[in-house]
Amino acid sequence: MTTPLVEMDGDEMTRILWKMIKDELILPFVDLKSEFYDLGLPYRDKTNDQVTIDSAEAAKKYGVAVKCATITPNAQRMDEYKLHKMWKSPNGTIRSIMDGTVFRAPITIPSIHPCVKNWEKPITIARHAYGDVYKSVEIRADEPGVAKLVFEGKSGKKQEVEIHNFDGAGVIQGMHNTDKSIRSFAHSCFKFAIDTKQDLWFATKDTISKTYDAQFRKIFEEVYESDYKEKFAELGIEYFYTLIDDAVARVIRSKGGFIWACKNYDGDVMSDMLSTAFGSLAMMTSVLVSPDGKYEYEAAHGTVTRHYYRYLKGEDTSTNPMATIFAWSGALRKRGELDGIKELQNFGDQLEAACFDTLNDGIATKDLVNLMEGVEAKAVNSAGFIAAIRERLEKRLG
């Protein structure tokens, strides 16, 4: 390696798996150069969350990061970890600093069949992770009255429309997005489609939302026409826009193998639907891509708290490390790609292939054994699964 990989450690059971993966599957085979940041909750609290900001800035500087799952604290976690403050989601902070879009895709194997029988290839969800209902403000109207939407421009120009004339109690919500954020989202989606050589679908409800959703559609079309149309044609891939309800129907009828770009809420809902329909959230990869081509790889799942508490009691755990392994393989492959190191790219490929070899041989964690068909599967603990992967990786690397 010539350029360091930004390494972000995390919390609970995934932190335990992180060390096992590094010790067994990375360090024996790769001369790893990494810039390390401890995003475990105790250290985030100790640094007043500065470590999260520093790690995101490092990802912007070096271009490729790999991240372990982390805790986003709630009231119970504040008490458990004796925190000074209820710190924000590290993913949200990193996403905001990198101005990135999250792409999630399932890891598919022949013995685990999707619920939708015609899906032959993975479907990647691109979620616009800014604004809309997640940045909304809300009012509870307790009496009759008029709700208005008012915009006061810096020029002094004022726009005002009536939302509703209430004859009784009700609720009111105001939400927003920005052209800058939508444009960044569009660039990230088109670049990722080119990177992975997949068709890109985008869907809103602009027939109903004739200003808000229509602006998303308009910006996507402008960005495509001005910056990406020729490259898409050259690669033989397609940009396709349709309404969100039509998109859902088309996705179910499709064979898969494309990127589905969604607004914030749609992406939140549909990514969970896809992960479940393809088999398991533990088999879902996640990569954050910025408009200027910076990448942060991680597993799509959380810190596996229940298994961690069992681990602390000395009990055996069979926690699925696949998505975390694929975060490492994806990050190392991308680092090799950017630095022109073919051996590193090949290692990423071979590590993933060794994982598939292990599963195809019927060796799996408990969660996967229950899903596998057509193969005599044997459940092993996390250490046993990682050891089996290492054995097959060594064979592949000669």
Place the predicted regions along the sequence by residue.
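Flexible, glycine/charged-enriched surface loops at secondary-structure junctions
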Residues: 30-36, 196-204, 228-241, 336-348, ...
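Glycine-rich phosphate/nucleotide-binding loop
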Residues: 251-350, 357-361
